[in-house]
Amino acid sequence: MVLVKKANGKWRMCVDFTDMNKACPKDSYPLPNIDALVDSASGCKMLRVLDAFSGYNQIKMHPRDESKMAFMTETCSYCYKVMPFGLKNAGATYQRLMEKVLAPMLGRNVQAYVDDMVVTSHERR
């Protein structure tokens, strides 16, 4: 485990999941084409980009998988109850869930790219 300073000055705890990532099959769920996402916003009168706050920490781990995410410090062992940052398939998992949650709006006035959402409108109200 290491602490990494983020751009905003806060700290992020990182665990090295290299071995776990090697053991897991890749989830090939496709991410949206970023160029198409940008193109879809052209000509809009209003545009908002939203970043999900601690988005990965909103996704609960399945209880049977919590022990697989265990790590040790000098004093104790811990396991994640939410999806940790650094897992190979975290982005695909997040994208899949965002598309499920936002399904009624996707392609109309909302686009999702992992933990970022673009909300557009052709009208100004």
Where are the language model's segments positioned?
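Retroelement reverse transcriptase polymerase core
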Residues: M1-R125
